[in-house]
Design a protein with these regions (language model features):
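Nucleotide-activated donor-binding/catalytic signature segment of Leloir-type glycosyltransferases, i.e.
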Residues: 1-30
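Short alpha-helical segment that forms part of, or immediately flanks, the ligand-binding pocket
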Residues: 28-29, 52-56, 70-71, 77
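A short alpha->beta transition loop at the rim of the catalytic pocket in nucleotide-sugar-dependent
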Residues: 36, 58, 65
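Aromatic "clamp/platform" in nucleotide-sugar-dependent glycosyltransferases that forms part
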Residues: 43
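Short hydrophobic beta-strand element within catalytic cores of glycosyltransferases
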Residues: 60-63, 73
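A short, well-ordered alpha-helix in the C-terminal region of glycosyltransferases
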Residues: 101-115, 122-128, 132
Length: 136
């Protein structure tokens, strides 16, 4: 973390977390809930949980439009999808300067997780599939 601290110019208002090793679930939960924005800038990503977890906790997300991320979060629903570092910086700045936008995205993101990714929805999908297969 020393390199990150040096890169931030020792700005006390800038907090960079690059390695969460040794940090427990309670702390990660607190970080995600208390953050104004979560950044998931991946160049390759499966269906990682960071994006969905942040949306469920009503925190807006700025994330790379790659891999499974767009399946979790449509642009403007939970956060902003980006393709470059410059777009990432602009999106973060936009959210920090417009907290109302962040709240709108966060609300939409939580609802998206509720609709598509929680256990009751997955069970309903399974039951519908079984019904279709069995012809009932």
């Amino acid at each position: 973390m020393t390199g990150s601290r040096n890169a931030s110019g020792k700005d006390p208002g800038l907090h960079i977390f690059t390695n969460m090793v040794g940090i427990g679930n309670v702390e990660v939960n607190a970080f995600q809930r208390l953050s104004q924005v979560i950044i998931q800038k991946s160049i390759r990503e499966g269906f990682g949980l960071v994006v969905s977890e942040a949306m469920w906790k009503s925190t807006p997300v700025v994330a790379g439009a790659t891999g499974g991320i767009p399946m979790q979060m449509a642009d403007g629903v939970g956060g902003i999808l980006i393709n470059s570092v410059e777009e990432c910086a602009a999106a973060v700045r936009r959210l920090l300067l417009d907290p109302r936008l962040g709240c709108e995205l966060a609300r939409a993101g939580k609802e998206r997780v509720r609709q598509y990714f929680l256990l009751p929805r997955l069970l309903l999908n399974e039951l519908q599939l079984m019904k279709k297969i069995t012809g009932m």
